[in-house]
Amino acid sequence: MNEFINFDEISRKTWQNLYNTSIAPLTHDELESIRSLNDEISLQDVEDVYLPLIHLLRLYKKNLEDMSYSKGLFLQKIVKTPPLIIGISGSVAVGKSTTARLLQLLLSRAFPKLTVDLVTTDGFLYTTNDLKNMGILDRKGFPESYDMEKLTSFLYHVKNGEKFEVPIYSHETYDILPNQSQIIDSPDILIVEGINVLQNPQNQLLYISDFYDFSIYVDADEKLIEKWYLERFDSLLKLAKYDQTNFYHQFTKMPEDKVINLAREIWARVNRVNLREYIEPTRNRAEIILHKTENHYIDKIYLKKF
């Protein structure tokens, strides 16, 4: 069966004409401040792709508010509108983080009186010591390396308007930062970004997907993602060259050809397998798929029909 049978395929040109918005445009400096390493994004992308998406999210938020109001009428009591939770998934190096930060900024502009928080699921990885003790350090990034029960608990608490402390993951140290956390306290909108956002833990009464009001999958051809991953790996090495505390510093002492081979080996052994077996199969669970081509250019959008 065609995976996209339940989606409308919309060209970028058609999509950009679906809605004209009055949201103040971003400056180039603002856009640069949220751009991830080696990601490509322009003000034209914001205007063509992301502002119509913001309008669509506005409709989903209104629908959530209307449903809460209707439930209150039925139950004859006040029902507080829960936060709108947006999930963003996709492969390593595909540009999820940039999309998440951009949406946070644009939603903050669209709803200036509301709180818009952003959390990455990296914070729910087990610590390096825990992974070693569990004997799965070489499986870091795969589903079993995440504390999915804690992630589910986090989403449950947020939906119920309760405070939650989220661990903070450092890409510099390649581990959870000890004694540091991000406090999420009753946001109006929450964006959750990570490779496992649309994955469901087994043997759970509650699925992660139950908590999302809207979900996005950032998609691209596997060969392109590999290219972007290798480029990012190279950029990370350059940043780590003079920082001995950086996880990637250890690789800066290696000959260039060996570093390239190492990056390719990590891609083939970890990231490609993870993409094929665990990430891409969740793609059709998303409400919308942003499809990228060369230079991270979004050429088409898939919107779920029902």
UniProtKB/Swiss-Prot annotation:
Protein name listed in UniProt: Pantothenate kinase
Pfam families: PRK
GO terms of molecular function: ATP binding; pantothenate kinase activity
Gene transcribed to yield this protein: coaA
Keyword presence, S-adenosyl-L-methionine: no
Annotated HAMAP family: Pantothen_kinase_1
EC number of the protein: 2.7.1.33
One CC-aspect GO term: cytoplasm
Pathway recorded for this protein: Cofactor biosynthesis; coenzyme A biosynthesis; CoA from (R)-pantothenate: step 1/5
Family: Belongs to the prokaryotic pantothenate kinase family.
NCBIfam families found in the cross-reference section: panK_bact
Primary location class: cytoplasm
Source domain of life: Bacteria
Catalysed reaction, written as an equation: (R)-pantothenate + ATP = (R)-4'-phosphopantothenate + ADP + H(+)
Keywords (A to Z) from UniProt: ATP-binding, Coenzyme A biosynthesis, Cytoplasm, Kinase, Nucleotide-binding, Transferase
Any one GO BP annotation for this protein: coenzyme A biosynthetic process
Compartments where found: Cytoplasm
Residues involved in ATP binding: G90, S91, V92, A93, V94, G95, K96, S97
